[in-house]
């Protein structure tokens, strides 16, 4: 299987002569700086987290002129696959100062609507969230084919990924690239914009011998409704030991209450969905965890670059994991400022 995948991707690269030239050599899609206060306790009432944390997430891309070739990387704080945050030392935990290139990959455009990528990459979520799938901080080392286009019966986006998921405590991508020779994960995902207000995706995943199907829908509702954004998703473990989970997220983002973006979500992800023996083969979003949970969120956009958000969530069953979790987050999006600085320097 592995030699076939490599040969397939390399053969596609031979058709890259018509690739569209990238307009810029160096791009900064994301440069977000965060700080948050986080509280977590367990069923017994034991406090496990009561800390002030910081985070940096930067996404960078270098385009090789006239070739369609590009390099991408996510540089981030955090020391494990399920966390992009580090402790300041204020609170219960000791300070930690970590910054790693968590992803690093090379891509090749194949005309206007296709690309292949090889390396340590982010996961593809489709129209769903990390409530029922991989934490957004998760990485995979492998190979990916991307197809994009608009057609009445064709998906707006299609990806096929073959890779390795593991090394949960190795945040440096260069310490994991040797896994390119191992395949324990495959995902085939199709996403479609059905109407101006509805987007849906469906996917098949195979991870360590576990077969899964996942579907998600995201809808924008009329401004006058009590709910303006609706997102529902479902994941089914087909074999072995079949089980399933789902999540629903509702947000009021328009009119009088829109300035605060109040939201409510419910998630139910049994521990067994991603369990391989005694281990979790995949970690979903840490703010959701496993089991039955309800959560309440808000988000206030102070300026174009600065926003504040809150979350409080409670476990509704006896599933292992945290009971209460609460956090207050401040985020500053520095990418526009860095782009202005970049333009000023290159215009001289």
Model-derived features: positions:
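Outer membrane beta-barrel transmembrane domains
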Residues: 90-92, 200-203, 227-234, 251, ...
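Signature for the C-terminal beta-barrel architecture of outer-membrane proteins
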Residues: 19-32, 39, 46-53, 68-70, ...
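Flexible, surface-exposed loop regions and adjacent strand-edge segments
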Residues: 48-54, 88-94, 133-138, 175-181, ...
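Sec-dependent N-terminal signal peptides
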Residues: 3-13
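Outer-membrane beta-barrel and related beta-rich outer-membrane complex signature
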Residues: 85-87, 130, 170-174, 276-278, ...
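Residues on the solvent-exposed faces and adjacent turns
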Residues: 120
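Beta-barrel outer-membrane channel/assembly domains of diderm bacteria
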Residues: 16-116, 145-152, 298, 308-315, ...
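A glycine-rich, basic-preceded beta-loop-alpha segment at the flavin cofactor/substrate interface
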Residues: 123
């Amino acid at each position: 299987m592995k030699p076939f995948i490599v040969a397939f991707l390399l053969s596609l690269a031979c058709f890259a002569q018509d690739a569209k030239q990238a307009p810029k050599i160096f791009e900064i899609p994301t440069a977000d700086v965060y700080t948050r206060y986080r509280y977590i306790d367990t069923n017994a009432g034991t406090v496990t987290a009561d800390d002030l944390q910081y985070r940096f997430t930067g996404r960078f891309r270098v385009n090789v002129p006239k070739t369609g070739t590009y390099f991408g990387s996510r540089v981030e704080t955090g020391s494990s696959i399920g966390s992009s945050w580090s402790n300041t030392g204020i609170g219960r935990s000791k300070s930690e100062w970590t910054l790693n290139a968590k992803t690093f990959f090379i891509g090749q455009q194949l005309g206007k609507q296709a690309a292949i990528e090889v390396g340590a990459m982010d996961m593809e979520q489709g129209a769903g969230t990390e409530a029922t799938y991989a934490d957004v901080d998760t990485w995979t080392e492998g190979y990916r084919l991307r197809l994009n286009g608009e057609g009445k019966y064709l998906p707006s986006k299609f990806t096929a990924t073959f890779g390795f998921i593991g090394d949960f405590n190795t945040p440096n991508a260069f310490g994991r690239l040797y896994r390119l020779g191992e395949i324990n994960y495959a995902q085939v995902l199709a996403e479609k914009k059905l109407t101006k207000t509805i987007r849906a995706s469906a996917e098949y995943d195979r991870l360590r011998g576990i077969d899964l199907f996942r579907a998600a829908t995201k809808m924008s509702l009329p401004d006058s409704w009590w709910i303006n954004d609706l997102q529902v998703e479902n994941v089914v473990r087909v074999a072995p030991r079949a089980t399933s989970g789902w999540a629903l997220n509702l947000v009021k983002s328009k009119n009088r209450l829109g300035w605060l973006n109040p939201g409510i979500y419910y998630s139910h992800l049994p521990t067994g969905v991603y369990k391989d023996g005694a281990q979790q083969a995949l970690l979903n979003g840490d703010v959701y965890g496993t089991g039955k949970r309800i959560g309440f969120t808000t988000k206030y956009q102070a300026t174009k670059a600065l926003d504040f958000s809150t979350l409080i969530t409670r476990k509704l069953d006896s599933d292992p994991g945290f009971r209460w979790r609460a956090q207050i987050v401040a985020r500053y999006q520095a990418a526009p400022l860095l782009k202005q600085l970049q333009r000023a320097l290159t215009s001289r």
